[in-house]
């Protein structure tokens, strides 16, 4: 068992403590726990009803003390541990809760059908009452209103002990009141009254409310069952992500033997073996072997990536072929995989401003409903209605009110969206991104590592004079690569990579800031700046001169290759644009967004890249702090700015923007600075991430409109006597079901 996220040391510093809170049944419960915690000096708490997690920033308090405060409020709490994140592949509390509810629901539904039929018959047609009819109805109703409804009664009793109320209080009081009134009517001395029409069984004939008590139980259980099942589905994406982690790992011993141990016991710098079909157990560096690695489950990237010795690999990915010996560089909770799982869970436990308002309303909702129900019943009595009619109205108000929908409106949408985003390689860190996204009008891109692959490559080879054959081209590239193979310059690596098999070099000489030279296969070869290569013999070849001018106008680097004193070729070296760059920029512009490029390159290079990918404007010669200044100036002009970068030298810009998107594998700076992490190194995920955020906000707004609108409309209708309690109970259950089901539509986001 892992230790709690926050220890007990250094109590005087502000520490973030996370607690699992059990026993909350509605948003009012979450609001009550949050209020209790926030009353403590030095404590700032946020309680999420959907995830049952309390996030607390506390000074001078240990986790045990905070758990005690929650216990006094009538709920159970325990420190949230890292294992509750990483072991989600085996833990599905909502699924288990749904199964428990289903058992009660099935029994209640089976008994409710004959109970409803007989209650209606006996109420409408008293002459149909057989001897012992009251005992028959009581026998059918008793298991439903006691055992099946016990989850509501138990919470209501616990609330009563702590002098609080919740949604369960409304339900339990409604069930108990309907049952007591019915038993009094059935076994009392009231003479039977004939009625006509099914509604008279509820409104004006004998007051047999047993089917109402049982019906409310059935409908609410059904609503809670579907709600729990839907929340289980909402968390399935996170469990699927956690499932990617390896369960066991084969550790390589010093004598070459292998020892299989649980992956949780793997230590940093230990070497382990991964074979085809196996999951890499930790982040690490390949020591031996070569293999294609399937990154799709982690990043959504369909194309396998080939790993060689010295290559970095990510835990949670799968080896497709070959055998790899890997040295672990990060294990357990320190891996990139674990960090991404934490990002998803943390996003699910945060609250939006709208949700805080909803929770505040839910906190006072239940007492207000009791007052409204009492006033409605009293008003009907004062107006001359009978006690039966007044009771029916009071009961209808009690059972139709539903703060649950308010509490579920935002977190269920966020749970589904963050889970779906994880499947697509998009990690939304919190509600800041969602609340900002709708006003974004400008997207700023870093160049190196964001629009480009971040690696220099030979983009063009221009031959001099008549040497235009493929054989001549390969020969010159081979000679240049042979000389450059002895150099450590970044451009040298690009030239070497362009030739499949460079030969050996002798007499290598490097001239700082100019170029290199050496003897290759009996030829004297020089590679370097055009001005250095032509220092003794000017080059007048039209093709080479044109290639030089064109390359330099685009901001690319041009080098000449001289063989035995004759300039043979011009090589253009540039950072290659990503294949997805132009399509991603076009997608953003089609959404009405302005695009800007920020780069440290010169003006020519910046304009060339902007033109190639279709960016509206470019700002050149930027230092990292200069990027922050540009973003700040845009914001002062009234623009809402999103910054897309790789987190390597643009961390401050990611923080300074209204919305930061870090693309690529994600450095520690990026994980801390960005609002959205795009794990897949594909720029098409930028518009996709913005679309997902917008879709999530639309869903949240729809949920909130429904939740508020339902209660605003339903309670007055019930108080006016226009709904019988049975239909009121069904409507209350449906309100929560609608919110959760609407959120589940986000599971299909991005599906083709």
Swiss-Prot record:
It is an enzyme of class 7 (translocase). The chain crosses the membrane at residues 105-125, 132-152, 167-187, 201-221, 361-381, 390-410, 491-511, 714-734. PANTHER family: ATP7, ISOFORM B, P-TYPE CU(+) TRANSPORTER. It is a multi-pass membrane protein. The keyword Disulfide bond does not apply. One of its GO terms (cellular component) is plasma membrane. Keywords: ATP-binding, Cell membrane, Magnesium, Membrane, Metal-binding, Nucleotide-binding, Translocase, Transmembrane, Transmembrane helix. The active site is at 446 (4-aspartylphosphate intermediate). One of its GO terms (biological process) is copper ion homeostasis. GO terms for molecular function: ATP binding; ATP hydrolysis activity; copper ion binding; P-type divalent copper transporter activity. Belongs to the cation transport ATPase (P-type) (TC 3.A.3) family. Type IB subfamily. This is Cation-transporting P-type ATPase B. It catalyses: ATP + H2O = ADP + phosphate + H(+). Residues 15-78 form the HMA domain. It is found in: Cell membrane. NCBIfam families: ATPase-IB1_Cu (TIGR01511), ATPase-IB_hvy (TIGR01525), ATPase_P-type (TIGR01494). It comes from Mycobacterium tuberculosis (strain ATCC 25618 / H37Rv). The keyword Magnesium applies. A metal cation binds at residues 26, 29. Its main location: membrane. Its EC number is 7.2.2.-.
